[in-house]
Amino acid sequence: MRLAVVVTLLVHCFLVTCSPGDNLDEFIDCTYACEYNRRCPNSQINYIDPETNMFHDIEFFDTPPLYSKLLFWDCISDCDYQCQHIITRWRIDEEEEIYQFHGKWPFLRVLGTQEFFSTIFSIGNFIPHYKGFVKFSRIIREEGDRRRKNSRSILIWNYLYVTVAGMLAWTASSVFHCRDLIITEKLDYFFAGLTVLTGFHAIFARMTSMFLYPKIAQAFTASVAAIFALHILRLYVDWSYTYNMRFNIFFGVLQYILLIMLSCQNYHALQKQKLMGEFKKTAYSSFKRQIFKLCVIPILLVIVTTMAMSLELFDFFSYEWQIDAHALWHLCTIWPSWVLYDFFLEDYAYWGNRQLY
């Protein structure tokens, strides 16, 4: 779910500004020694005191050529990486607390990726959005072939935009967890903002039946697109983690509220059908299935996603298994995306069969 992605970024921003490992004297001495011994280009370290720097005689390794060329690991960043693990192993041997560096736990590179499990689970999150894209694209083609372009098409197009934003966001997340650079971080943040806006746009248009009024729907879509453009411009002119998080959380919370309201709206519509006798006794099980699919599922999505956020709030890390709470959180967001698109399809089919609003 999209608010979950935003909360993840919020926690990351907080950790970046207060990672205790960055300020360890031994970590600083280690990076100085590595840059000096390896003669790193663009390094400002021209001398280290062998009497005070305990790392002066350590043999540091050269950056693997594949990492250097494909993943942009230069000498300085590789020294930072090596020293993180030198210090971490030393602290483990001394039975001291493992510290974060630059807002991240000290992960070992696996196949060149900085955070292997977060990368894998981000790719896993891409799949339900891609599957949703395929399903909604098929519906659009079928309705186009049947020349049934009507107000329902607007609703499906809105859901298609959500899938595209989701694919972009999780692609950016995969790249960011594979290699943390300024550009990959910014793209991760930008597309997270796009997901909350497209989700808000689609659910709000559905709940208000805006798709029945094409001109109003077009104006609303243009307004949301303008908001996103201004959001990116604001960050380009003056990057602010605080502003970015407030923006994303605002629209993310609105999404959750709208999902709950849509659930209530569907419930009242189903109850109205029941009172009108549209659900006979023999078909009561059908009524219960509809209640579950159209009313219970969206509320479950909100509850499950909110509960899973505790993985971010109560962070933990296993150096032995190279996995942390953030990676497990990405694992927990795969199922809600599958279910969300199934809900969109069920709701779309239900509205198409019964003109209730």
UniProtKB/Swiss-Prot annotation:
Lumenal side: 23-113, 177-189, 234-248, 315-324
Positions of transmembrane segments: 114-134, 156-176, 190-210, 213-233, 249-269, 294-314, 325-345
GO cellular component terms, A-Z: endoplasmic reticulum; endoplasmic reticulum membrane; fungal-type vacuole membrane
Keyword Membrane: yes
Protein keywords: Endoplasmic reticulum, GPI-anchor biosynthesis, Membrane, Signal, Transmembrane, Transmembrane helix
InterPro entries linked: Per1-like
Residues annotated as signal peptide: 1-21
UniProt key word Ribonucleoprotein: no
Membrane topology: Multi-pass membrane protein
Organism encoding this protein: Saccharomyces cerevisiae (strain ATCC 204508 / S288c) (Baker's yeast)
GO process terms (BP): GPI anchor biosynthetic process; intracellular manganese ion homeostasis
Residues in the Cytoplasmic compartment per record: 135-155, 211-212, 270-293, 346-357
GO molecular function, one term: hydrolase activity, acting on ester bonds
Record-given protein name: Protein PER1
Function according to Swiss-Prot or TrEMBL: Involved in the lipid remodeling steps of GPI-anchor maturation. Lipid remodeling steps consist in the generation of 2 saturated fatty chains at the sn-2 position of GPI-anchors proteins. Required for phospholipase A2 activity that removes an acyl-chain at the sn-2 position of GPI-anchors during the remodeling of GPI. Required for efficient transport of GPI-anchor proteins.
Compartments where found: Endoplasmic reticulum membrane
Family: Belongs to the PGAP3/PER1 family.
Miscellaneous: Present with 3050 molecules/cell in log phase SD medium.
